[in-house]
A protein has these predicted regions:
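N-terminal, polar/charged subdomain of small-to-medium soluble alpha/beta proteins
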Residues: 1-95
Length: 95
């Protein structure tokens, strides 16, 4: 899984790209059939926002998180996506 990372009003540094890629690779332990990942990191005034769209088998998953810095926003985003992926996996098992 290679995430597609874009920035709005923020420059994506190599360190940030590496951090995000490492965090998103951990999501595969929750659901291994993630096809595509689109991540948007943006800054609105003083708020750092991280959005993600995941294309998975059986649908799409979207999450958004805010933080005081971009690293905190990405951590919050990963937590939300992990919960959603676990729920999605359980739904697929029930059918």
């Amino acid at each position: 899984m290679q995430p597609n990372i874009t920035g709005h009003n923020v420059e994506i540094t190599p360190a940030m790209r590496e951090f995000v890629t490492a965090k998103f690779s951990k999501l595969e332990q929750f659901f291994d059939r993630i096809n595509q990942v689109y991540i948007v990191l943006k800054v609105e005034k003083v708020t750092q926002i991280a959005d993600a769209n995941l294309h998975v088998n059986g649908g799409e998953i979207h999450a958004s998180a805010e933080g005081q810095d971009m690293y905190a926003a990405v951590d919050g985003l990963i937590d939300k996506l992990a919960r959603q992926l676990t729920k999605h996996k359980d739904k697929l098992k029930q059918h």
